[in-house]
């Protein structure tokens, strides 16, 4: 097969591993910067051009689209889809997952347990918003934040009011969430490919922090997950219509709670921690699903 990887930086670990895994299995691979793709949208002859040339047909496309370029990145991916390329995560699913509010609404509607959460733009009554999620301590986040950026633990009511008021001054959407103390700064990252959790790690926050993101200096170890955690991770990915997802779970006294569903999970931390060839599993999923029937359905 001919496979395109959409990424702004082909030197990143995840891109290199996906390219390596695809080549090892006999496929041709090209890494394309989605921002350098430009599209001819024409009912008679749509096409995608890249750095002065018209791109050939790709059997499959692997999107590694960063949050900052979600709009144009998903538009480029959508053009590949319309030309009959199989996407490892469809553009609409990526856009849905990047919308934290919509994601939580969809997960809640499917009965997937979440931390008690309130979302507001400019709350007229900060005190009522705090009460709505059970009071302090609580976590205040910017809805648009990623990798632990724009996330604050407010341990007292006064601190919570101050943080919310400060975020409100940024004209930003605010997410207020109960703090799961018993998780002790740890979460579980489950890597889902299709209908299987192929790997799981426990991520621990660095000392003095509560954010377990590896980008923020957290540490990781292999996690043994329960059947309930496995089931909720698969259900969360399926709810978001993602074939590949990183599902972050907190272990609360009342059971596992889904924190986030990531549409473009990094492979470095979880592959190096577990020793599992996740990139290879992703390529094998593509081999099973990038069929002629898919291309005909999408118009390729």
UniProtKB/Swiss-Prot annotation:
The answer on whether this UniProt entry bears the keyword Nucleotidyltransferase reads no
Keyword Ligase appears in the UniProt entry: yes
**How is this UniProt entry's protein used in applied science?**
This protein may find application in fermentative methods that use microorganisms overexpressing rimK for mass production of poly-alpha-amino acids, which is thought to be the most economical and ecofriendly manufacturing process.
Listed A to Z, the keywords are: ATP-binding, Ligase, Magnesium, Manganese, Metal-binding, Nucleotide-binding, Protein biosynthesis
**What organism, scientifically named, is this protein from?**
Escherichia coli (strain K12)
Q: Which Pfam families match?
A: RimK (PF08443), Rimk_N (PF18030)
Give the gene that encodes this protein. rimK
The protein's name in its UniProt record: Ribosomal protein bS6--L-glutamate ligase
Summarize where Mn(2+) 2 binds, as residue positions.
Answer: 260, 262
């Amino acid at each position: 097969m001919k496979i395109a990887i959409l990424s702004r930086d082909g030197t990143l670990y995840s891109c290199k591993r996906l390219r390596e895994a695809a080549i090892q299995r006999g496929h041709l691979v090209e890494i394309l910067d989605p921002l350098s793709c430009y599209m001819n949208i024409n009912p008679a002859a749509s096409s995608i051009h890249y750095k002065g040339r018209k791109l050939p047909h790709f059997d499959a496309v692997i999107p590694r689209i960063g949050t900052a370029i979600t709009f144009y990145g998903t538009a480029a991916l959508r053009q590949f889809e319309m030309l009959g390329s199989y996407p490892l995560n469809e553009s609409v699913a990526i856009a849905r997952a990047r919308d934290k509010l919509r994601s939580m609404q969809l997960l809640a509607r499917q009965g997937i347990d979440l931390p008690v959460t309130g979302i507001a733009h400019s709350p007229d009554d900060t005190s009522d918003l705090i009460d709505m999620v059970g009071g302090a301590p609580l976590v205040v986040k910017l809805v648009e934040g990623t990798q632990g950026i724009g996330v604050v633990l407010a341990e007292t009511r006064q601190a919570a009011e101050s943080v919310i008021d400060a975020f409100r001054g940024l004209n930003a959407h605010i997410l207020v969430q109960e703090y799961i103390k018993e998780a002790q700064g740890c979460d579980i990252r489950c890597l889902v490919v299709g209908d299987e959790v192929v790997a799981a790690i426990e991520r621990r926050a660095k000392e003095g922090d509560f954010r377990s993101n590896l980008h923020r200096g957290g540490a990781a170890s292999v996690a043994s997950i329960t059947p309930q955690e496995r089931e909720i991770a698969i259900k969360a990915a399926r709810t978001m219509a993602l074939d590949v997802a990183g599902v972050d779970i907190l272990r609360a006294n009342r059971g596992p709670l889904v924190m986030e569903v990531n549409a473009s999970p990094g492979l470095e931390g979880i592959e190096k921690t577990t020793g599992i060839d996740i990139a290879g599993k992703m390529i094998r999923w593509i081999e099973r699903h990038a069929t002629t029937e898919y291309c005909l359905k999408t118009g390729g």
